[in-house]
Amino acid sequence: MGAGILRVIIMDSENYVETHPSDDNEAMKTSDVYKVDKNLPKRFNNPDCFQGYSTKINHPFYQTSSQIYGSKRPTVHEMPTTFNGSYRKFSEHMLKSGMFRDNGFNTSIEKSKITGHDTIPMFQDRINFNYAYDSGNGPKN
């Protein structure tokens, strides 16, 4: 008899824990141990699909605890039991409207290090501002 997997069954309603040794070599799923959501993606129900993130082996003296933790495969106890997908409401709005631009009234003069100390940068006018990079002397009017 080889080293089998210790299978744990947890019943939430009674707080009852039952353990059974498993002789078969089938992979343990999250749904075997915990009650999972019906909309849980398959990758969260099967932790064996994650192989760990570290492929390069470092000297143990220079390894951090995060590298050690990230190199190991997750167990069923570390996998999520529910999945709440994010809404794309903000992204869709930003796609249609664009990023926020501050077009407020500025009362102070902003000096630019690129065009020189005696010129005022023109942030909104990209075409006229770009040629200041070539000459280094600032906009010529």
From Swiss-Prot:
Record's protein name: Piercer of microtubule wall 1 protein
Gene that this polypeptide is encoded by: pierce1
Organism this protein belongs to: Salmo salar (Atlantic salmon)
GO-annotated cellular components: axonemal microtubule; cytoplasm; nucleus
Coiled coil (UniProt feature): none
Pfam family name, one: PIRC1_2
Family: Belongs to the PIERCE1 family.
Keyword Cell wall biogenesis/degradation on entry: no
Database matches in InterPro entries: PIRC1/2
Main localization of the protein described in the UniProt heading: cytoplasm
Taxonomic path: Eukaryota, Metazoa, Chordata, Craniata, Vertebrata
This protein's UniProt keywords: Cell projection, Cytoplasm, Cytoskeleton
A biological process term (GO) from this entry: determination of left/right symmetry
